Amino acid sequence: MSEIIIREITESTSDDINIKNERFKKFGKMIPSYQNGKWDYTVSENEGESWDCFPDENYSFEKMAKDHVFLGACDGSVCVGLAILRHQWHKYLYLYDLKVNSAYRGQHIATDLISESFKYALANGYRGLWTIAQDNNLAACLSYINNGFRIGGFDTEVYNGTSLEGSADIYFYKDV
């Protein structure tokens, strides 16, 4: 296994922000609950196996650089993981996108990207990070929990009237 280096993506390496999305296994759903001012969750596992893949974005470094920061996980000169952070008016930096090339999954690269994102947030006056994951992307949801995020909200309406109807968004926060 080669050493993966996390670095900020700059204009000279801006092509790295368009690494391809790759398929991921959908094996269950996170079900949040809110009682007495506290969030909790249960997990419902799927019967059978299914896969999904988000459409590729066509990010423009030039258009996004003003209010976004890009961190790349690099194996030599090849970007194999990406975290995109968006500046916010409130005290949480938004983890806008997080992805790792499928051949590199299981090597804690997402954890390293989250860790560097959190350091960046703190160094820039934020009190932490926030992000969103679909409830049926259980691997992502559990990864956020395992990386110190907590549930802070749940949107059951966002996908109504779309091909994703029945899915919901879970809001995750990681505090100082």
Where do the protein language model's features map onto the residues?
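Acetyl-CoA-dependent GNAT
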Residues: E11-S12, I19-Y92, Y96, N101-S102, ...
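Conserved acetyl-CoA-binding loop-helix of GNAT-fold acetyltransferases
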Residues: V100, G106-K119, I145-N146
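Short secondary-structure boundary/hinge segments and terminal tails
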Residues: Q35, L95, L122, A139, ...
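DNA-contacting interfaces and partner/effector-binding or oligomerization modules
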Residues: S2-I6, E11-S12
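Conserved short alpha-helix immediately C-terminal to the canonical SAM/SAH-binding motif I
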Residues: L113, N137-A140
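Conserved GNAT acetyl-CoA-binding A-motif
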Residues: A121-A133
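Short loop/turn motifs at secondary-structure junctions
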Residues: C79, Y94, G125-R127, G148
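C-terminal "cap" of GNAT-fold acetyltransferases
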Residues: E3, Q134-N136, N147-R150, E157-V176
